[in-house]
Curated annotation (Swiss-Prot):
GO BP terms, alphabetized: intracellular protein transport
UniProt xrefs under PANTHER family: DRAB5-RELATED (PTHR24073)
Name by which UniProt lists this protein: Intraflagellar transport protein 22 homolog
Gene3D superfamilies, per the entry: P-loop containing nucleotide triphosphate hydrolases
Membership in a protein family: Belongs to the small GTPase superfamily. Rab family.
SUPFAM superfamilies in alphabetical order: P-loop containing nucleoside triphosphate hydrolases
Top-level division of the source organism's lineage: Eukaryota
Residues binding GTP: 10-17, 65-69, 125-128
Any one GO cellular component localisation term in the record: endomembrane system
The keyword RNA-binding belongs to this UniProt entry's keyword annotation: no
Keyword GTP-binding: yes
Length: 187
């Protein structure tokens, strides 16, 4: 079974921890009092029925819920080591988040040379905010990345399905990379 390391990054108070808890089926109530993540939380779980090419498979997921505070910037290289994908979470109702995610993109995605298929933008709508599901106005480099809207109050299973599609893409890329590596050894 593949093991996939996904970083969940983005501005402070955008909903990364609530999303991580939901995706990993961690039992903490949605909408609890805000408590900022210190450094990183690593959640491990199995994800099933992922579409990896023309077959369905499973993988072990390490979801790294990374702190949104820039005081932890010195830890970022250690967090990025051996990561297979990055999901950038932001609250589209907070104008500063739209600008701040450009910094997260530069630090975590372009610096690692990740491919678009290894990345995901998640416009996370907080409970009671009323979800505008239009694509927000983003910088050109961010417009190339796939975007999903997350509303855990109204459509939680849709969020899980979209995240699982993303995991399937990452797994497929890992599988193809492994096959290429094996073929280069043989030839």
């Amino acid at each position: 079974m593949f093991k996939v390391k996904i970083l969940l990054i983005g501005p402070s108070e955008c909903g990364k921890t609530a999303l991580a808890n939901f995706l990993s089926d961690t039992t903490e109530s949605i909408g609890a009092d805000y408590s900022p993540t210190q450094g990183v939380r690593i959640l491990e779980f199995e994800s099933h029925n992922l579409h990896n090419g023309n077959k369905s498979s499973s993988c072990d997921v390490e979801l790294w819920d990374c702190a949104g505070d820039f005081k932890f910037e010195s830890c970022w290289p250690a967090l990025m080591k051996d990561s297979n994908g990055v999901a950038v979470v932001f609250n589209p109702d907070v104008p500063s988040h739209l600008k701040e995610i450009e910094t997260w993109y530069s630090a975590f995605i372009s610096s690692q040379g990740l491919l678009e298929g290894q990345c995901l933008l998640i416009a996370h709508h907080k409970p009671g905010s009323g979800a505008d599901t239009n694509r927000p106005s983003l910088a050109p480099q961010l417009n190339k990345l796939p975007l999903i809207h997350s509303n855990l109050e109204e459509e939680p299973e849709e969020v899980r399905q979209e995240f699982n599609k993303y995991l399937g893409k990452v797994m497929r890329m890992l599988s193809e990379s492994q096959e290429r590596e094996e073929m280069s050894i043989i030839t």
